[in-house]
């Protein structure tokens, strides 16, 4: 009886735990779409209502992929110092999402696309900077290896997608000079180019296992873009959509629609998968002489019932997108995928058996602990208390602190273990309960909240309303001015009321006066060449010319050649003459053997030319003489032949 009772108790506890842990409809696990914004991952349901957000600790998220077999999301952060690719596990009862580093950072990686193979548990990603495609196991047992190297040929791998059933990898080469869509076996063999014509810059790519087709984004020249499709071998190529003014990056495909992210509008858009234009379809022209119109076929008209639909407006730049497709449930009987799905399930079941409780005693203690302390709380028998994990409170850890805490925002537990709200754009307050536009704009004005939290919201006023809150009715104000002007012609009327007064005067000219502005043409077309402008212009030109003249003069003085050195040589020939009584040492010098040379240098510089040099003795002897002819003889330059 004791064993039977214990077994029944264990069974009841297990049933209770199963009921507590089984996800119900509308719980955070039941998400259908996930997108990567710049600083977080946002989860949405089938109606594109935000369920939760995660990965707030990252700064630059980009690519994302999803493993439906184990409910794991893999994403890339371009600014993380240690890791490059991470995994995120969402749990129904966990306060925070479990994030683990999967691929370490080795340099300045720039991940363009990310894909996952659940059979081999390998991640595949494209590196735009290194121009290579890598792969590595998620358990870190091996270093990343190169699957495709496009650096030598100048390729630029962007989007990547794995065909799990046929064991192939597809990627887009966004090199504008030679864009392609290619594929290769997952073992690195049999590389094939499947699309290389009529394509500009392919970006994101996805394999639709439900329809056995490829879908990719083509960023066309100018402002246009297209979403195209083909069979897995590149045949039967179709243009699903062609539009403009979008900057699409990545896409996801469901059973009946295509979804893509747009950086320009920060939105997610959708369009039916049914193609409307065939690339290879051409119409035969009608010849001028032909009378049979049966040979001419009009091109297929564009389906007007398939417009673009903006399904989500997001607060940040949106980049990657994944969708829950029910791949493993819907492809169990597919002849290409049945064996792969079976192998993946066997692997997942084998992993789950490792976490089963091995002993009955451990199982009993775990059941008692789960029965007393909920949400993984730690039970303390000595004090009969539950130590709750972060994010839960209550005597049994039964209250989730973030439950209904934020009115218009996402709740996350802060580092100090308190709930914190990340408000949606346009809301503020501790719990995001206050709208920044509440009662702000009057008279039908439209409030626009800035994306920058530091900027205040602004009002877009309708016609004939103004002011910071659209509180000023320009028609009523100008009507008062126009009526008063009828009685007080000298009153000032604002310039903006001129057109309103003219409209009112057409219906009621007896009580309305139109202001007459004497210098209206001056206000509308101001004269540029005024007297002050001309004076300033003339002074500037004259000053510029004077400055140029001073510079030229200084340069000429700086580079002016030096005055030449003047040398003059006097040659005195030897003459025989007798010594007279009046000879002195100055007049009767020793004679050279042949002749005597006298050199006078820089005569002009020494003012010799202006003041001639005289022989002192001869001057004394001839002081009494006044003849000019005699004075010339005593000059040095005239004494070459007369002194001896």
Swiss-Prot record:
Its primary localisation, in coarse terms, equals membrane
Q: Which residues lie on this side of the membrane: Cytoplasmic?
A: 553-644
GO BP:
canonical Wnt signaling pathway; oogenesis; spermatogenesis
> Which range is the signal sequence, renumbered to this chain?
1-26
Q: Which residues are glycosylated?
A: 82, 108, 175, 190, 196, 313, 473, 508
One GO cellular component from the entry?
plasma membrane
UniProt LDL-receptor class B repeat ranges:
121-166, 167-211, 212-257
Which ranges sit in the Extracellular compartment? 27-531
Tell me how this protein sits in the membrane. Answer: Single-pass type I membrane protein
Tree of life domain: Eukaryota
- What keywords does the record list, in alphabetical order? Cell membrane, Differentiation, Disulfide bond, EGF-like domain, Glycoprotein, Membrane, Oogenesis, Repeat, Signal, Spermatogenesis, Transmembrane, Transmembrane helix
Give the InterPro entries listed for this entry: 6-blade_b-propeller_TolB-like, Cueball_EGF_LRP_Nidogen, EGF-like_Ca-bd_dom, EGF-like_dom, LDLR_classB_rpt
Subcellular location per the Swiss-Prot or TrEMBL entry: Cell membrane
Record-annotated EGF-like domain positions: 398-430, 433-471
CDD domains in alphabetical order: EGF_CA
Q: What does this protein do?
A: Has a role in spermatogenesis and oogenesis.
User: What family does the Swiss-Prot or TrEMBL record give for this protein?
Assistant: Belongs to the cueball family.
Protein's name according to its UniProt entry = Protein cueball
The organism's taxonomy opens as: Eukaryota, Metazoa, Ecdysozoa, Arthropoda, Hexapoda
Q: Which gene is this protein's source?
A: cue
């Amino acid at each position: 009886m004791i064993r039977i009772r214990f077994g029944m108790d264990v069974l009841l506890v297990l049933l209770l735990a199963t009921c507590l842990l089984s996800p119900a409809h509308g719980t955070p696990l039941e998400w259908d779409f996930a997108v990567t914004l710049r600083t977080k991952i946002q989860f949405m349901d089938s109606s594109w209502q935000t369920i939760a957000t995660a990965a707030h600790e990252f700064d630059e998220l980009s690519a994302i992929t999803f493993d439906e077999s184990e409910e794991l999301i893999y994403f890339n952060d371009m600014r993380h110092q240690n890791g490059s690719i991470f995994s995120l596990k969402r749990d129904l009862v966990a306060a925070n999402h479990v994030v683990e580093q999967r691929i370490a950072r080795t340099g300045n990686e720039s991940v363009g696309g990310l894909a996952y193979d659940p059979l081999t548990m390998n991640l595949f990603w494209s590196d735009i900077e290194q121009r290579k495609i890598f792969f590595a196991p998620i358990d870190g047992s091996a270093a990343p290896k190169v699957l495709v190297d496009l650096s030598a040929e100048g390729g630029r791998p962007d989007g990547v997608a794995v065909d799990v059933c046929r064991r192939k990898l597809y990627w887009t080469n966004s090199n504008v000079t030679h864009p392609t869509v290619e594929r290769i076996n997952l073992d690195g063999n049999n590389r094939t180019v499947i699309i290389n014509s009529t394509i500009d810059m392919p970006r994101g790519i996805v394999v639709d296992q439900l329809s056995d087709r490829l879908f990719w984004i083509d960023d066309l020249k100018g402002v246009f873009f297209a979403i195209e499709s083909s069979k897995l071998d590149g045949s039967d190529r179709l243009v699903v959509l062609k539009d403009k003014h979008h900057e699409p990056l990545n896409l996801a495909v469901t059973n009946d629609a295509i979804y893509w992210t747009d950086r320009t509008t920060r939105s997610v858009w959708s369009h039916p998968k049914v193609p409307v234009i065939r690339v290879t379809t051409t119409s035969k022209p009608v010849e001028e002489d032909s009378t049979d119109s049966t040979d001419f076929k009009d091109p297929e008209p564009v389906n007007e019932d398939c417009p673009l639909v903006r399904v989500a407006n997001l607060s940040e730049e949106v980049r990657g997108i994944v969708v829950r497709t029910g791949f493993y449930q819907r492809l169990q009987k597919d002849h290409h995928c049945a064996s792969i799905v079976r192998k993946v399930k066997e692997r997942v079941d084998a992993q789950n058996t490792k976490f089963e409780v091995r002993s009955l005693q451990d199982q009993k203690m775990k059941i008692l602990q789960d029965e007393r302390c909920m949400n993984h709380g730690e039970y303390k028998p000595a004090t009969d208390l539950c130590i709750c994990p972060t994010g839960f409170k209550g005597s049994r850890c039964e209250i989730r602190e973030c439950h209904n805490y934020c009115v218009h925002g996402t709740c996350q537990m802060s580092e100090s273990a308190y709930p914190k709200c990340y408000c949606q754009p346009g809301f503020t307050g501790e719990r995001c309960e206050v709208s920044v536009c509440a009662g702000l704009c009057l008279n039908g004005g439209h409030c626009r909240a800035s994306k920058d939290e530091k900027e205040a919201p602004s009002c877009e006023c309708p016609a004939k309303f103004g002011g910071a809150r659209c509180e000023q009715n320009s028609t009523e104000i100008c009507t008062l001015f126009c009526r008063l002007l009828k009685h007080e012609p000298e009153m000032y009327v604002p310039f903006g009321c001129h057109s309103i007064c003219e409209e009112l005067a057409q219906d009621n000219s007896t009580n309305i006066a139109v202001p007459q502005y004497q210098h209206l043409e001056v206000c509308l077309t101001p004269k540029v060449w005024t007297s002050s402008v001309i004076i300033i212009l003339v002074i500037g030109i004259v000053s510029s010319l004077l400055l140029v003249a001073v510079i030229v003069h200084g340069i000429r003085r700086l580079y002016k050649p030096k005055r030449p050195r003047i040398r003059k040589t006097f040659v005195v020939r030897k003459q025989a003459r007798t010594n007279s009584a009046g000879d002195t040492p100055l007049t009767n010098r020793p004679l050279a053997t042949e002749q005597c040379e006298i050199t006078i240098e820089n005569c002009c510089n020494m003012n010799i030319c202006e003041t001639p040099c005289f022989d002192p003795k001869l001057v004394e002897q001839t002081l009494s003489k006044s003849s000019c002819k005699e004075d010339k003889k005593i000059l040095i330059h005239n004494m070459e032949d007369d002194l001896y």
